[in-house]
Amino acid sequence: MAANWLLLDGSSLMFRAFFGIPVGTFKAPDGQPVNAVRGFLDMLARLVSDRKPKALVVATDEDWRPAFRVKVIASYKTARLERGAMPAELQPQEPIIWAILNAIGVEVMGAAGFEAEDVIASLLPKITGTVEIVTGDRD
């Protein structure tokens, strides 16, 4: 049975798409890499086709290392501090992905100071029916 709601951790899936397709495999006419755009849209199409949700929300990280979480766990995502939060080739692709989703009517939600999983958790009490959460995060 299909879930009524499909909630996606968009930031996590965007990183998976970026690292899953080598940079340079797909380029925009201006030469900019769009591997993450292509990979994300392919994943989204497959998820919607396979799961047939009645409603879809893509949550985003507006802060990948929230202060409230670091206060509790000082080492939270410290490895990313050394290598940087986002690869340079991915940065220009992020707004393209969110713009495409908005253009096709997919709700994209984020909250300042929070990660996508926090946004998803805040939606759950407001949702009736079955829910499926899709993320690449392991925490």
Label for each model-derived stretch:
Residues 2-134:
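Noncatalytic, basic helical substrate-engagement surface that gates or grips nucleic-acid strands
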